[in-house]
Amino acid sequence: MQDILLIKYGELALKGDNRSFFENKLIKNIKHALSDFKEVKVEKTHGRIYVECDGDIEEVIERLKKVFGIVGITKAKKTDLNLDEIFKAAVELMKGHEGKTFKVETKRPNKSFPYNSMEVSRRVGAAVLKNVKNLKVDVHNPDVLLNVEIREMAFVYAGVIEGIGGLPLGTNGKATVLLSGGIDSPVAAWMMMKRGVEVEAVYFHSPPYTSERAKDKVVDLCKVLSQYGQRIKLHVVHFTDLQLEIYEKCPPKFTTIIMRRMMMKIAEKIAQKNGSMALITGESLGQVASQTIESLYVTNASVSMPIFRPLIGMDKTEIIDLAQKISTFEISIRPYEDCCTIFVPKHPATKPKLEKVIEAEQKMEYQKYIDNFEEEVIEV
């Protein structure tokens, strides 16, 4: 008898002709997540993905809970085609469910097995009732469904541990996220990763107005995001000179929106150079002055690349809840200013007109900064 995990996936099963592509990518991502477990084996048989574990199964489960594309993880036992072994496996699995109701459900694709599905279910149920205290059978609405599958081997499993869901990372191209160090942008990156998008990150650094600790905070956020399946390339752009140019030469009410437009232009250049097909931001409609629908329209007009804003309809409390769930919140609230919080005007324009903003931009020579920005690349 061997402990294994049965991996359940949702949307992948709906992908038609591309199903094998998604399944193979998921298997590759599972192997990557478990690469330092020498005793783990991953395989796909009968349309199922199995993970065989000889070591710490709980630690393996914790890793798998961060693999996008997995909707459920089920602890299972693989045994020989022997009723006594099947009974033993069923009893072990049900020992954690005392006081509950259960039902046994058997599938028997292997028709050479001498007992039919009903007989296997009946015998397994009797063995469980005999050896596990305080259990009752409920065939209509059981607390626990105990499954038995009779194939070339027998598989016995019960209960499901919730996975993270989504699509396997790497199945939907690559995008570049503008990562500020605040609460919102890492959540936006995570949400796009959940839809199968690989991400790179751009952080705008403005020393001496922003400290090295602010940059370290962004590096730490990338480390957390990388736990969900990929190493993240962080592009640190030195933004001080361009930010001072904006502050000194542009009307105060437009400095925030112009700064956002310059960031977009630089991020687009980095994205194009590195094979990204879109930008990602953590903007939520109406949250601050630069996130009104008019401001977002003006920001969009600065680039030709699509801009994804997965948080656009979320409340701040919803964003914070998700940040706490994915373990970025405590890092994001470290008290170190980023470049978006310096030189903030008292009365920023909330309904800027594109032509007025472009006119204001002409007061400075911004193109030389965009063409010759200083960049540091950190792989996390």
From Swiss-Prot:
Alphabetical GO biological process terms: thiamine biosynthetic process; thiamine diphosphate biosynthetic process; thiazole biosynthetic process; tRNA 4-thiouridine biosynthesis
CC per GO annotation: cytosol
Pfam families: ThiI, ThiI_fer, THUMP
PROSITE patterns: THUMP
UniProt entry tagged with the keyword Transport: no
Enzyme class: transferase
EC number per UniProt: 2.8.1.4
Keywords: ATP-binding, Cytoplasm, Nucleotide-binding, RNA-binding, Thiamine biosynthesis, Transferase, tRNA-binding
InterPro entries linked: Rossmann-like_a/b/a_fold, ThiI_AANH, ThiI_fer, ThiI_N, THUMP_dom, THUMP_ThiI, tRNA_STrfase, tRNA_sulfurtransferase_ThiI
Catalytic activity: [ThiI sulfur-carrier protein]-S-sulfanyl-L-cysteine + a uridine in tRNA + 2 reduced [2Fe-2S]-[ferredoxin] + ATP + H(+) = [ThiI sulfur-carrier protein]-L-cysteine + a 4-thiouridine in tRNA + 2 oxidized [2Fe-2S]-[ferredoxin] + AMP + diphosphate; [ThiS sulfur-carrier protein]-C-terminal Gly-Gly-AMP + S-sulfanyl-L-cysteinyl-[cysteine desulfurase] + AH2 = [ThiS sulfur-carrier protein]-C-terminal-Gly-aminoethanethioate + L-cysteinyl-[cysteine desulfurase] + A + AMP + 2 H(+)
Subcellular location: Cytoplasm
Single annotated GO MF: tRNA-uracil-4 sulfurtransferase activity
THUMP domain mapped to chain residues: 58-162
Family classification: Belongs to the ThiI family.
Record's protein name: Probable tRNA sulfurtransferase
Organism: Thermoanaerobacter sp. (strain X514)
Protein's gene: thiI
